[in-house]
Design a protein with these regions (language model features):
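ATP-binding N-lobe of GHMP and related small-molecule kinases
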Residues: 18, 26-130, 148-157, 182, ...
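DPxDG-like acidic metal-binding loop motif
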Residues: 130-156, 172-174
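Glycine-rich beta-strand-to-loop/alpha-helix junction loops that act as flexible
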Residues: 134-135, 285-290
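Conserved, helical-rich catalytic subdomain that frames metal- and/or nucleotide-binding sites
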Residues: 175, 180-282, 297-300, 307-310, ...
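Short hydrophobic/aromatic beta-strand micro-patches
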Residues: 293-295
Length: 325
């Protein structure tokens, strides 16, 4: 059994190491009946959204970085063959068959033919409807746990294919560090080592209003003509310049979806303006929101900024300091 008390960062690396081992090596784990897998949040450091494709998805390019904010997913072999149970303490509204983690179990069964009962426990720390990828990350951590428990090990390519069936951004959570995603988000590659090393450990402040945003609504309000990078070659060039050191992280940071967000939610626009003018910060929306973030400059006193955010949005918001993995 893998102990649940292991540090999230340490286990996140261990889980991804195990999933890439050869099947014969994985037989050492055949006696496990329960695993606990941390599910990290992500932020979009760069997101450019292109034209809508024939399948109704937009062509996009995005740089996603994992942050030190985790849900914890416990996967246990159940007693009833073919059954799936899910428990989400404090979030009963997502403990149902629509949860992406449950959908991942169903897809995993269809691929492997394994009918073992599966009991899921998801302990949430990542806020929902935030653009932090919590639901997708939970689903992928479920898949990693299932692969650890199973005697039929799936290859990394199989895991990528299976995760893409559940959600466009799911494959990105199979990469432990920062990655570049393209297509509808399902085509991924790791960020080049030098760029990945440079951003690892970077401090960020995450802050989210008490309300969540609908991804479909934000995409529905988006106008491709407003993008600074309407062509995919422009998107790719921007990312390549950053990876090669020609562009700083701050200069890379951009999100097409911030345009409809800031038009609709003027309370975010007002706060962003004050953060830029008073504190010279570069706040961004993550994905389709509603969580926002900025890079914390080295030696910067963050407390006055936190107080400004609380004063602007109220004390019941989500706010936490974190670091990029």
């Amino acid at each position: 059994m893998v102990a649940c008390s292991i540090e999230p960062i340490q286990f996140f690396g261990i889980a991804h190491f195990f999933q890439k081992l050869h099947t014969s090596r994985m037989s050492l784990l055949s006696g496990i009946c329960k695993v606990c897998v941390p599910a990290p949040a992500k932020i979009n450091l760069f997101l450019s959204v292109g034209e809508k494709r024939a399948d109704n998805f937009h062509e996009l390019r995005t740089v996603l970085a994992k942050v030190q904010l985790y849900d914890l997913v416990t996967i246990r072999k159940g007693k009833e063959k073919g059954s799936t149970t899910i428990s989400c303490p404090g979030n009963i509204e997502i403990a149902n068959e629509h949860n992406l983690a449950v959908q991942m179990v169903n897809h995993w069964r269809s691929v492997t033919g394994i009918e073992d009962g599966i009991d899921l426990l998801i302990e949430k720390k990542i806020p929902m409807q935030a653009g932090l990828g919590g639901g997708s990350s939970d689903a992928v951590s479920t898949l990693i746990g299932l692969n650890l428990l199973s005697h039929k090990k799936l290859s990394f390519d199989d895991l990528l294919d299976l995760s893409a069936r559940v959600g466009s951004d799911c494959p990105s959570f199979l990469v432990p560090g920062a990655c570049v995603a393209s297509g509808r988000g399902e085509q991924i590659r790791e960020v080049k080592p030098d760029a990945c090393k440079e951003i690892s450990g970077t401090r960020v402040l995450l802050f989210k209003p008490s309300c969540g945003f609908s991804t479909a609504d934000i995409y529905g309000r988006y106008q491709v003509g407003d993008s600074l990078f309407p062509e995919t070659n422009q998107m790719d060039e921007r990312i390549e310049h950053w990876e090669s050191g020609q562009l700083s992280l701050i200069d890379l940071m951009y999100n097409d979806l911030s345009l409809p967000v800031l038009k609709k939610f003027i309370f975010i626009t007002a706060l962003f303006k004050e953060l830029r003018e008073r504190f010279k910060l570069n706040p961004m929306v993550s994905g389709s929101g509603s969580c926002c973030f900025f890079i914390i400059p080295e030696g910067f006193d963050i407390e006055p900024v936190k107080q400004l955010i609380f004063d602007s949005w109220g004390e019941d918001i989500f706010l936490t300091e974190s670091k990029l993995l």
